[in-house]
Regions:
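Conserved Nudix-box catalytic region and its N-terminal flanking loop in Nudix hydrolases
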Residues: 33-73, 159, 163-171, 194-206, ...
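Residue-level signal for well-ordered, solvent-exposed loop/turn and beta-edge residues enriched
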Residues: 32, 83, 111, 162, ...
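Active-site segment of metal-dependent pyrophosphate-handling enzymes
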Residues: 76-111, 125, 226-227, 259-287
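Cysteine-centered motifs
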Residues: 3-5
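Acidic, metal-coordinating catalytic segment for phosphate/diphosphate chemistry
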Residues: 8-24, 30, 172-215
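NUDIX/MutT-family hydrolases
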Residues: 104, 113-143, 164-172
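Active-site oxyanion/phosphate-handling segment shared across diverse enzymes
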Residues: 136-160, 168-171, 286-287
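Conserved hydrophobic/aromatic beta-strand scaffold that supports enzyme active sites
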Residues: 26, 35, 100-104, 122, ...
Length: 287
């Protein structure tokens, strides 16, 4: 989530709603990001998480003024080259909204100082996914890695700090429940692209449609995959298949995929569970 709570700077009250404005920056050097491990304050929404550096706007500040001041205060560095990468809208529960300007920086001067918000550490970019991060932060790390253009990301968390909704440039993103080997839910929800990048175990549904005939016994309906698909393009495949979205059940997901892919309206009584298969393979997925 990377919400940055330091007193009441940058807060606006709209009725019972608390609105905040902040900046967050990931400073780059030698293929590493400067990460802040928030281990100092007891009552910290980011307690034990790893985030970038930044903070809330002071009165009258622009995003860039806030960025430069916060980086200087927390790291001792003066940024000399930075890029505005995106705006992240956080919604937390019913009463907290934060608008966070997200930056990366690749040049700076100055001598590092100790940070009273936590411990600063340079971390290899390919190790970032191993850190204790907010699930929404994993999404914008993916975006920072995969695209150059400015983006708008909306992240909604419930009061249990579980990601409930994400949208990129106004378009909802797919979220999956991460599951255990026995199929039970871990309580973690990941965005589709993040789940695929990290190899997180998640559920899919595969449905074969059959009908009786007078010759071989049964016909099986196959679907020829589009040539633009990431996996097995142009191949004949299962009648219908798809991911199980976060919060959805297996049967309702199977019925949804039948309807969306084939236009078939079915009921739970029309389906027979054959079994559970665990599969794993490596491929390049786009989203």
């Amino acid at each position: 989530m990377a919400c940055i709570c330091n007193g009441l700077r940058g807060y606006k009250r709209e009725g019972l709603e608390m609105r905040k404005e902040s900046t967050l920056c990931y400073i780059e050097q030698d293929n590493k990001y400067l990460m802040l491990h928030r281990v100092v304050k007891k009552n910290d929404v980011n307690k034990d998480k790893w985030i970038g550096v930044g903070g809330h706007f002071e009165h009258g500040e622009s995003p860039e003024e806030c960025l430069l001041r916060e980086v200087k205060e927390e790291t001792g560095y003066t940024l000399t080259s930075w890029k505005y990468r995106g705006i992240v809208t956080f919604v937390y529960g019913e009463d907290v909204i934060e608008y966070m300007s997200l930056y990366t920086a690749d040049a700076f001067t100055g001598v590092p100082i100790e940070c009273d918000e936590g411990v600063l550490e340079w971390v290899e970019k390919d190790r970032i996914k191993e850190l204790n991060l907010w699930e929404g932060d994993r999404i914008f790390f993916r975006l920072l890695d995969e695209r150059e253009e400015f983006f708008s990301l909306k992240l909604v968390y419930n009061k249990s700090n579980v990601l409930e909704y994400a949208a990129l440039d106004g378009i909802p993103m797919e979220l999956f429940d991460v599951i255990n080997p026995d199929g039970s839910k871990t309580g973690v929800v990941k965005e589709r692209g993040v789940a695929h990048r990290e190899g997180a175990l998640h559920a899919t549904v595969h449905t074969w449609i059959v009908r009786k005939n007078d010759k071989s016994g049964y016909d099986v309906l196959l679907q020829k995959r589009s040539l633009c698909k990431d996996s097995n393009p142009g191949s004949y495949d299962i009648s219908s298949a798809g991911h199980v979205d976060a919060g959805d059940k297996i049967l309702e997901s199977a019925l949804r995929e039948l309807r969306e892919e084939l236009g078939i309206e079915a009921t739970e009584d029309d389906l027979t569970e054959v079994g559970i298969h665990r599969g794993q393979f490596e491929a390049v997925f786009h989203g």
